[in-house]
């Protein structure tokens, strides 16, 4: 985790009652000091994420899938926010594949302890994804250069 005992979580959802319940659960957690910030609109939340750079984003699945994907893509395309792990808070166990999500939590089973362990795992997963992505990008570039060199060698 971090060296500090404080961990900034950004909660995004459209139900103030659910969000405040989660925020309350996090504030009572004894193993870590969670500081929760809240967003209800994806567009406003995106600008807050860019300004505050939280340690973790917990996103409710209440938004349309296309908006969620766009939100995640904007975070992943920004060098300053690409490492922030994102978890989806789901109301059902229905499988939905969304690139850029490191973890899922069911609303019925949500607890600060599960979040704590999810954060530890998600940070490792996200860092590994970034390393693999960069290595893959580098190898593709090397392959293209090699292909171009071989083509020039035999065509000239």
Enumerate the language-model features and the residues they cover.
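Two-component/phosphorelay signaling modules centered on CheY-like receiver
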Residues: 4, 12-37
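Nucleotide donor/acceptor-binding cores
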Residues: 7
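Conserved phosphotransfer microenvironments
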Residues: 19-20, 41-45, 50-77, 90-92
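His-Asp phosphorelay/catalytic-motif detector in bacterial-type signaling
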Residues: 32, 53-55, 79-85
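Short, hydrophobic beta-strand segments that form beta-sheet elements in well-ordered domains
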Residues: 37-38, 85-90
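Alpha4 helix (beta4-alpha4-beta5 surface) of REC/receiver domains from two-component response regulators
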Residues: 70, 89-109, 113
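Receiver (REC) domain switch/output surface
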Residues: 101, 112-127
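C-terminal output/effector regions of signal-responsive regulators
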Residues: 124, 130-156
